[in-house]
Amino acid sequence: MTAAENVCYTLINVPMDSEPPSEISLKNDLEKGDVKLKTEALKKVIIMILNGEKLPGLLMTIIRFVLPLQDHTIKKLLLVFWEIVPKTTPDGRLLQEMILVCDAYRKDLQHPNEFIRGSTLRFLCKLKEAELLEPLMPAIRACLEHRHSYVRRNAVLAIYTIYRNFEHLIPDAPELIHDFLVNEKDASCKRNAFMMLIHADQDRALDYLSTCIDQVQTFGDILQLVIVELIYKVCHANPSERARFIRCIYNLLQSSSPAVKYEAAGTLVTLSSAPTAIKAAAQCYIDLIIKESDNNVKLIVLDRLVELKEHPSHERVLQDLVMDILRVLSTPDLEVRKKTLQLALDLVSSRNVEELVIVLKKEVIKTNNVTEHEDTDKYRQLLVRTLHSCSVRFPDMAANVIPVLMEFLSDNNEAAAADVLEFVREAIQRFDNLRPLIVEKMLEVFHAIKSVKIYRGALWILGEYCSTKEDIQSVMTEVRRSLGEIPIVESEIKKEAGELKPEEEVTVGPVQKLVTEMGTYATQSALSSSRPTKKEEDRPPLRGFLLDGDFFVAASLATTLTKIALRYVSLVQEKKKQNSFIAEAMLLMATILHLGKSSLPKKPITDDDVDRISLCLKVLSECSPLMNDIFNKECRQSLSHMLSAKLEEEKLSQKKESEKRNVTVQPDDPISFMQLTAKNEMSSKEDQFQLSLLAAMGNTQRKEAADPLASKLNKVTQLTGFSDPVYAEAYVHVNQYDIVLDVLVVNQTSDTLQNCTLELATLGDLKLVEKPSPLTLAPHDFANIKANVKVASTENGIIFGNIVYDVSGAASDRNCVVLSDIHIDIMDYIQPASCTDAEFRQMWAEFEWENKVTVNTNIIDLNEYLQHILKSTNMKCLTPEKALSGYCGFMAANLYARSIFGEDALANVSIEKPIHLGPEAPVTGHIRIRAKSQGMALSLGDKINLSQKKTSL
């Protein structure tokens, strides 16, 4: 710390355009001015002293003319003045004038006004001169007996601070405060006194607690919090004391203060692993979540429950509380509900899954009865996914869940309906006994489906799993009902012509007969080429989709019709019925092809859809055994393989999670005997208070030992050269929302450098919080300068600047050393994250910013390149490992990450290895990045480009 910093620890901005007052004018105002003028003058004196001015001539003036005043504002300002003014001579001896000031302190400590007494006591806590405090000790002791609690609690603080700094001034402080604590009634005074005993004489604090341990519940919350802290520290240092105080912690779980309950529950978990203790703490957490209105509090406490679940023995206890945890679903916040459902799903077992499903079904029904809202739709999706997972893990529950969920296939919210469809598809494949039920329910809701995407999926399921004549006939009936009158073109033209009034039937051009590809005649007029606007709600669903130009559903329908027709032929032996059914299926396909080629739809049919429908027509016309196997066996096997791979992937990830959580004990691990263990080694748990303090200070200890590159030295950036007059290097410490630059500045010359200033500026979404203050560097001296930079979003930022200084005694202009740029790494703010394929596709469609990066590397292996990109970008690969295994010369993978600011980043890697260039040919291709903000997309692209260049060196 420099000499300037030693005195000037607070900087107050002074307007540059104002003239600084002279010492003479200030002295005149302090001597002859009224109270208002003296107040203003005293403020100016304080600011000048804080900014480094000495003003020794004003000390006696203030003692003579300002100190005797009884004005409260002046007394407040005087306390600040006495705190900052130099009180000693250069050789360290107390100034003679301070004896007069000491007498003024004593009078204020005996002042009838309790505020003046209390504020003086608070001021005495900041004094570091024992000679000033010694004469005041009797007055400070007397304040412990004052009638007002404000004076008493500040007297306790003053005694504690003096005892800690100068124990010889009041050696009996612990005994004095203990006696005071026994007789005190005010909660804040008791809290301060008890806090002092904890730090000054812990044994006395424990003795006091032992005498009143049964009355702890009646204490104020501020004292209860201190008691919890004491019990934790004592039991952490000396585990044998746990039995003595654990009952007190149990009692504090019933406190009226949420803060006390939270701390008591956390302490109880660290002190005891008994099932009763864990259950009591968990129950306390659940009550807090339900009763607290702040969603942030709910999420914090939910995180504590999740931490409890990570311990295998605690998890078994929490499984009995699943139904209590589900009470949290009454909270309207989506994030809280999401975390609650995930926790309940992790804890559910065969004992309580039935009750869980009943509650979730009720919640699903509730979402129908509330006003539609974006969060309601998302909550419904969460419930569907949770029920889906329950049914897969506990197949017996599927029969209860399916009827409720099938109703949502006709929901207006396509996302929720898609989740239901995914669940139904998996259930009908896995559970053979449920197929008749699912097909029956699917046929019931089929006509009410509003989304073309859901309609396609439902068609596929019906075509794949209808195995009886009756079901096949029912599917055909539903398709005919959904398609309406056929042929579609003729019926639509008639319908439109019939809806027109006689005076509106004006033919723009001559009516002509056209021969279609099928060899039939189609009448076309101006009416069919420009249709009038009309209501479309009365159209059957499938007909509406086709007229809107969505012929992809027609291709799906053709496949379904082919499957059920081939299956019908195998079930029914009568040739006439076989031919009739096949002819009906072919007629439907033909009429759709006819519609697609006409001008009635909003968009014409695509060539791909024409090819698909034509192929199905050909299959039905030939009915070969090979095509029969492909349509009725191979398709189902493909689904089976996909679901098996998905299940295997989930099991593998669960296994990895459980392996992380399970702490295995090795055969050669040492056995700990309590009687033979030193006190400081007794508890294996870390001190939670110390950890929370470190976290608050931004000193969270990361596991850096395993990776030497993650050490602090790796984050040191050289800012100037070794030959520059001033050498500078910076350690870049990245916190969540800000960056701290710790800059080492070294004077490499033989001159004294005055007004040495670090001037910084930023590019990107960075903001310099405050300008570093100038300093003076002696020859070959060094100093550390800290600068804070605020970060607002995930974007590559650059910090640049220079160091300017004056050389002592030189008449030249200011000297300047330009600093190297500091690049802020986007990777410090990006974390791997997961999302479903549907969510990925939805975000991909919504995000408007795309950055396409061309692959330019010397890596020759596709998998190696993908792993390199994952490591460089901190993203997670969503594509299953099995889909990436093997070698076929090309690879496609989806990557996802989320920033600490809640921004999503998507990437699609599409790479190949050109075989014609030989085995040593590098990987080629491109990476497409999508994000909501331009900065995120560009920054991630820059990072990938940079990492590729490093690889190719």
From Swiss-Prot:
It is a peripheral membrane protein. HEAT repeats lie at residues 17-54, 96-131, 132-168, 240-276, 277-314, 316-353, 396-433. InterPro entries: ARM-like (IPR011989), ARM-type_fold (IPR016024), Clathrin/coatomer_adapt-like_N (IPR002553), Coatomer_bsu_C (IPR011710), COPB1 (IPR016460), COPB1_appendage_platform_dom (IPR029446). Keywords: Cytoplasm, Cytoplasmic vesicle, ER-Golgi transport, Golgi apparatus, Membrane, Protein transport, Repeat, Transport. Pfam families: Adaptin_N, Coatamer_beta_C, Coatomer_b_Cpla. GO terms for biological process: endoplasmic reticulum to Golgi vesicle-mediated transport; intra-Golgi vesicle-mediated transport; intracellular protein transport. It is found in: Cytoplasm; Golgi apparatus membrane; Cytoplasmic vesicle, COPI-coated vesicle membrane. GO terms for cellular component: COPI vesicle coat; cytosol; Golgi membrane. Gene3D superfamilies: Leucine-rich Repeat Variant. Its main location: cytoplasm. One of its GO terms (molecular function) is structural molecule activity. PANTHER family: COATOMER SUBUNIT BETA. Oligomeric complex that consists of at least the alpha, beta, beta', gamma, delta, epsilon and zeta subunits. The coatomer is a cytosolic protein complex that binds to dilysine motifs and reversibly associates with Golgi non-clathrin-coated vesicles, which further mediate biosynthetic protein transport from the ER, via the Golgi up to the trans Golgi network. Coatomer complex is required for budding from Golgi membranes, and is essential for the retrograde Golgi-to-ER transport of dilysine-tagged proteins. This is Coatomer subunit beta. The gene is COPB1.
